[in-house]
Amino acid sequence: MSNAMTSKLERFIDQGVGRVPADIVLKGGCFFDLVTGELVQSDIAIGADRIVGTSGNYEGETEIDISGRIVVPGFIDTHLHIESSLVTPHEFDRCVLPYGVTTAICDPHEIANVLGAAGIEFFLESALETIMDIRVQLSSCVPATHLETSGADLPIESLLPYRHHPKVIGLAEFMNFPGVIHKDPICMAKLDAFQGGHIDGHAPLLSGNDLNGYLAAGIRTEHECTTASEALEKIRKGVHILVREGSVSKDLAALMPIITERLSPFLALCTDDRNPLDIAEQGHLDHMIRTAIASRVEPLAIYRAASISAARAFGLKDRGLVAPGWRADLVVLDSLENCRADMVFSAGRRVTDALFSSRRPVAPIGLDSVKARPVNAAHFGVPVAEGETPVIGVIPGKIITEHRRYRLPVRGNEAAVDLANDIIKVAVIERHGKNGNHANGFVQGFGLKKGAIASTVGHDSHNICVVGVSEDDMARAANRLSEIKGGFVVVEDGKVTGEIALPIAGLMSLEPYETVRDTLHQLRKAAFALGATLEEPFLQLAFLPLPVIPHLKISDRGMVDVDKFALIG
């Protein structure tokens, strides 16, 4: 051990014993003991980045009065894609840390699907600069499947150089569960390389012996549970369940029956995909905690899931409790029930605007990633099918879709939209400059009566996805995305009525999160003016091309029957 470390430890010991003042002391409040469930009236002494004393009286070089307030451990978001916040990691840090999220475990597979290893390096470089502790899971499935065209390919050889990076935890969500079960050689190589480390799961609706086989590969965490029964089967088989509540995937209500003190050691919280507008209006993990307690979940259960249980699930042994020797990631709350952060400490540093200003900026990348071919109305024709036509059925608040079938109206020799049944056109256009693929189909559930909306955010390969009533408007929206280098676009009667540019890989803005938030307000209004009924139409649109989530999706290669893991002929 170095002399510097010995000296540092000696100072921690002296501060804990009370021989010398702590760096910071929080006085007059209490803390929530997540071991016993007690509210403990106590000073909290901080030395550098760790807690050095509790359950006593301390003097500090800086003393902060928190009378009447409660201190809890910093919250840990155990699975998210920062790209879905539509801002850079630096702006995500500034946006979310004040809500008490002191650790975020991200999978940068959105940017990796567009830019490959360069996208992962951008996140790792950013994570070294943020105030929040951003940890990175290495994207396991780039591309997610062979049923779509992505911008990059990340074989195991591309991941191994990052395996021991200080910000890397392990292998990110293994979405290709059929590949695991059927022992696909590419999947096997990645799983083998990360045995003994953390491997994150992604196995919606998988059960029985197939689930056993999937877990036998060493997968330990999973965030795709949408029912309590699904979660219980996985918990019984040793899986740590990450309860999800994002901007589209809202599973908290369905999973509340399992959020109990008994099961809380095997639970954690995550957002997966959450945009700045929802964060500004509702919050982040604090929103999940408030919602759960309002629905009579025991505070001890949900606060454990938000911190200590989450830390243990991912091997972060230094955080998750308000106790001596633990990392000083702390949130000062008005009450456990309201869960409003009055003050946040990240590694012993009080979170302020000045602290964010001290970060080194990281240069943006991928500013010319949208290489789609121009389209016109004729590109969106769908030939009349014999019998019924497959239609993607959108379920509000879910990324799972239904495989529906309808006899559609005919216009000329083409199938047409059916507004009476809320069925409109959907198309995916390859935008990485590889093959110019273009696939068309139908979707039900957006509520559009006119116009079109389009996006370069299209999980997971992030091709252009557009839905609409008018083929002319669909073409205008798709072409406009190329002009602004990616983003979201709303078109009505040939005119762009709303847009946001996302030029970093076609996924993230160069603007501050406040600007993105305000622009999203206007964008939603433009979508609602077309008749959109979904609470989050753009993120819901972004999941239509995701062929690893049941049941019917669309990629640039065509309609995908996810249950059969095959294109529909």
Swiss-Prot record:
InterPro entries listed in its UniProt record: Adenine_deam, Adenine_deam_C, Amidohydro-rel, Metal-dep_hydrolase_composite, Metal_Hydrolase
GO biological process, one term: adenine catabolic process
Known catalytic reactions: adenine + H2O + H(+) = hypoxanthine + NH4(+)
EC class name: hydrolase
Gene Ontology MF term list: adenine deaminase activity
Keyword field: Hydrolase, Manganese
NCBIfam families per UniProt: ade (TIGR01178)
UniProt family annotation: Belongs to the metallo-dependent hydrolases superfamily. Adenine deaminase family.
Protein name per Swiss-Prot or TrEMBL: Adenine deaminase 1
Species per Swiss-Prot/TrEMBL record: Rhizobium johnstonii (strain DSM 114642 / LMG 32736 / 3841) (Rhizobium leguminosarum bv. viciae)
